[in-house]
């Protein structure tokens, strides 16, 4: 019953109209009021995790786009998910083994260009859209933070430090201010969850929830500490693209919010935005 009351209270709060322009809000409040993250800008598409897909997400109203960061051998930060180039491009070998110029000559599958530089995404956003950037390796930490500093992006960029504490510590050795999201998962998830929460880090804004840590007690602990929670919507119920009429896409964001989670990470930002607009009716049930 208590969990149900908390979930309804969240739905009502999330449905309340914003009183300030989104890009004027502190990052945590911006995420609280606009709790939708477009996974790779929308997925799966040939141009997922690229500027063109992010622009499509922005045009349908997505407040946050998610991406993956890796480093070239000469220190340039790019958007790319896999360790190897061979599955998503016409090149082969480890991503980190190539220079920026070589990477940019690799064609992404179905596209006429290679992976985008993170700096290009910062230039495109300029705070209009929040950037949720997953740090795929320790080597990309400092160059990525340097770009956040250069563009004054502390209130519209946050980094995912994944599972465990290694990447979290790598970030904090270099920068105490940048906002973070952690994602404890796997056999040691509960230990990592407790350790991260005990740090009392005000800039660890978000804890991504997985089956090992999702409970009413943990949600209460996080919210009492002022932290936000997030979840991959497609892990709750499938998000599909129907290949037959009416060719619709279906997000699972309502299923995330019904559990009292703050932020839904979705493959289908347009449908997720429509679901967010229906929250007042959902809360009134």
Regions found by a protein language model. Name each.
Residues 1-7:
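Bacterial N-terminal signal peptides that target proteins for export
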Residues 20-285:
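Phosphate-group recognition and catalysis centered on beta-loop-alpha active-site segments
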Residues 15-16:
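N-terminal signal peptide c-region/cleavage motif recognized by signal peptidases
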Residues 8-9, 19:
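Cleavable N-terminal signal peptides
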């Amino acid at each position: 019953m208590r969990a149900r009351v908390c979930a309804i209270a969240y739905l009502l709060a999330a449905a309340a109209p914003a009183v300030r322009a989104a890009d004027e809000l502190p990052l945590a409040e911006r995420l609280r009021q606009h709790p939708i993250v477009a996974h790779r800008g929308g997925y799966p598409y040939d141009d997922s995790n690229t500027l063109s897909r992010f622009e499509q997400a922005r045009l349908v109203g997505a407040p946050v786009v998610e991406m993956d960061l890796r480093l070239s051998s000469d220190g340039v930060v790019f958007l790319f998910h896999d360790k190897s180039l061979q599955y998503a491009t016409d090149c082969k070998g480890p991503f980190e083994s190539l220079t920026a110029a070589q990477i940019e000559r690799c064609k992404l599958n179905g596209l006429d260009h290679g992976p985008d530089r993170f700096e290009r995404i910062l230039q495109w956003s300029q705070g209009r859209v929040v950037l949720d950037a997953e740090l795929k390796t320790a080597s990309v930490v400092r160059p990525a933070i340097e770009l956040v500093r250069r563009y004054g992006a502390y209130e519209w960029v946050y980094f995912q430090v994944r599972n465990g504490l290694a990447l979290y510590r790598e970030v904090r050795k270099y920068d105490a201010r940048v906002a973070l999201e952690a994602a404890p998962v796997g056999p040691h998830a509960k230990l990592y969850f407790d350790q991260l929460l005990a740090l009392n880090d005000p800039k660890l804004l978000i804890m991504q929830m997985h089956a090992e840590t999702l409970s009413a007690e943990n949600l209460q602990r996080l919210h009492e500490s002022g932290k936000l929670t997030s979840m991959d919507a497609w892990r709750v119920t499938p998000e599909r693209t129907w290949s037959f009429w009416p060719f619709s896409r279906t997000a699972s964001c309502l299923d995330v919010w019904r559990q009292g989670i703050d932020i839904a990470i979705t493959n289908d930002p347009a449908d997720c935005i429509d679901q967010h607009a229906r929250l007042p009716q959902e809360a009134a049930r």
